Structure formats: structure tokens, C-alpha cells
């Protein structure tokens, strides 16, 4: 039981520190708080000056492949969020999830201006989504959550969390 009580020991300790949060929220007031990342491109999910400690990473993730004409073309309709849910009518599916998505996308974490990242892994492997097949689970360091109707689908959209404390001295960068 001493290990469990150790988890909560610091809750009542006053610390001389500051808290912060990075988010992708849409400042225009719309619900387009997402990033589209073209193949071969890299975006920065966050860059923080230190010293500090990343204590939680949370994100949702989805990758749709358009398999027929679609209203979700961001070139033709910039106001249509590609994360909208459009359920198939009469069994016709206009787009589908990329079954290999969680293996194709890499997460890269670099500390203190290192030349090589300390973390470089497929997104699914980092968040415990083996073989691009997400399933609901919760553990102390990781959590994956998906809607019941998405269960059993390779590349299905889900939300993921990581609670590993990741301390750094000068800077942390997540791509």
C-alpha cells in the first residue's frame, strides 16, 4: 500500500512552480481545433521552455481516406471539418479510415536541444495501439478510448493519453 500512497504524496505539498497547457483550440470560435498533416510533413505539437516537466499528453487522432467524391474536400469546402461524422446512407461509404495510420505517423520528442530525439516511435506504438488496432483500456501511464461503434476497426479514431512524467532542463519539443 505504500506505493499507492506515494502516488498521492505530492498532492498536498506546496510547490514553487508554474503550470501551463498547450492546446490546438480554434481561436476563431469554430470547432476546427485540429491540424491536417500532409504526408511527409511535420508539425510541432508543442515547444516548451524549461526547466519543467510534461505530465500529460492528450489528443484525439483520426485519418480518413476518401474513397469516393466527398463533401469533406478541404480545398473545395474549407469550413467542413474533416473530423465530422457522416454516417453511411444506404450502406454507401464515401470515406474510410486508413488501417495503417497509427504505424505511419511518428511521434518525436526532443529534450534540451538534442540533435536526435529521445522518443521516435509510431504514434500507435507509443500510445499502446498495437498493429493500428485501437481498443479501450486504461492503465497508470496510458489510456486509449474509442466509441463502441468504432471498436474492431483498424485505424479507428480514438483519444489517447500518456501520463509519464517527462522532465527537461532547457526545452521540450513534441512533433
Model segments located where?
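Beta-strand-centric surfaces of beta-sandwich/beta-rich domains
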Residues: 1-175
Amino acid at each position: 500500500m505504500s506505493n499507492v500512497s506515494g502516488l498521492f504524496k505530492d498532492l498536498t505539498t506546496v510547490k514553487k512552480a508554474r503550470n501551463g497547457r498547450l492546446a490546438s483550440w480554434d481561436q476563431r470560435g469554430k470547432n476546427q481545433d485540429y491540424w491536417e498533416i500532409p504526408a511527409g510533413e511535420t508539425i510541432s505539437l508543442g515547444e516548451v521552455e524549461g526547466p519543467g516537466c510534461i505530465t500529460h499528453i492528450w489528443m484525439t487522432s483520426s485519418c480518413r481516406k476518401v474513397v469516393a467524391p466527398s463533401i469533406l474536400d478541404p480545398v473545395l469546402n474549407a469550413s467542413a471539418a474533416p473530423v465530422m461524422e457522416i454516417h453511411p446512407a444506404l450502406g454507401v461509404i464515401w470515406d474510410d479510415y486508413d488501417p495503417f495510420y497509427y504505424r505511419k505517423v511518428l511521434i518525436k520528442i526532443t529534450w534540451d536541444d538534442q540533435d536526435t530525439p529521445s522518443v521516435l516511435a509510431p504514434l500507435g506504438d507509443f500510445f499502446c495501439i498495437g498493429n493500428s488496432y485501437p481498443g479501450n483500456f486504461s492503465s497508470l501511464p496510458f489510456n486509449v478510448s474509442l466509441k463502441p461503434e468504432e471498436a474492431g476497426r483498424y485505424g479507428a479514431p480514438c483519444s489517447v493519453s500518456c501520463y509519464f512524467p517527462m522532465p527537461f532542463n532547457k526545452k521540450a519539443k513534441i512533433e
